Amino acid sequence: MTKKIILRIAYQGTAYSGWQYQPNALSIQEVLETLLQKISRTRISVIASGRTDAGVHAQGQVAHFCCPDHPHFSDPGQIKKMLNALLPHDIVIRDVIATNEDFHSRFSAITKEYHYTLSLLPKPLPHHRLFCFSPRHKLCLESMREAAKYLVGTHDFASFANLGREYSSTVRTLYALDLLEQEHLVTVICKGNGFLYKMVRNIVGALLDIGKGKYPPEHLLEMLEKKDRKKGPPSAPPYGLSLHHVCYPSPYHWFCKHEHNSSNEEK
């Protein structure tokens, strides 16, 4: 009988080509699949909630894989310990669930939350430098917050979708777009029902133009109406972005907020 294993994963994306397998570069998916196949001696595909780009991090990526009955995959707690003992230091399994239910890490997700971290210092502190972007320009956070309001809700985000991709629809819903300031760091919190390719980084790039005074806050409304990515600002760099968490309906809602209180985290 085949069982389904669900993983919640954190990783530092600096050394990887992103989540998805690449023929000439190391990916998070390749590391996990190679390890699982060595353990099970069976070809295993690991499917994630979303494909993070090269250099992008995750605190709460969710993925699943199917495997036949195997003694090493019988207990979720042991799976977690085994994988964490064998994975490199920049990939950590935070939680494991075993289920036979109809769950899909991508299609069962109801919301995703990304965090993009900005440093207000001209040179980020050493322990932050791999996880934040410094625009090296004074930012008006109030203007950025005012601009962010225009993007909350259901809109056609074609102006924020990178070219070269085909989409059945560019309409998405943003439930929240907030800026949280803590000392010299600003976190852009973006929560929605789904995201287009590089959409979050393109939104941050547009907010930075507003913060620098290049455009008024209303410019983001104009961008929405034009539906033209060619007139948009450059994307923010990948290393400031992190997939913070993915939410699912019951019984998988423990992947949502307050995830740090999960009992599995301590095991």
Swiss-Prot record:
GO molecular function terms noted in the UniProt entry: RNA binding; tRNA pseudouridine(38-40) synthase activity
Cystine residue pairs: none
Enzyme class: isomerase
Catalytic activity: uridine(38/39/40) in tRNA = pseudouridine(38/39/40) in tRNA
Keyword Isomerase set for record: yes
Superkingdom field: Bacteria
Gene Ontology biological process terms, A to Z: tRNA pseudouridine synthesis
Keyword Isomerase carried by entry: yes
CDD domains the UniProt entry points to: PseudoU_synth_EcTruA
SUPFAM superfamilies from the UniProt entry: Pseudouridine synthase
Record-annotated active site: D53
Residues binding substrate, per UniProt: Y114
Annotated EC: 5.4.99.12
Keywords in alphabetical order: Isomerase, tRNA processing
PANTHER family on file: PSEUDOURIDYLATE SYNTHASE, TRNA PSEUDOURIDINE SYNTHASE-LIKE 1
Binding partners and assembly: Homodimer.
Family: Belongs to the tRNA pseudouridine synthase TruA family.
Function noted in UniProt: Formation of pseudouridine at positions 38, 39 and 40 in the anticodon stem and loop of transfer RNAs.
Name of the protein this chain belongs to: tRNA pseudouridine synthase A
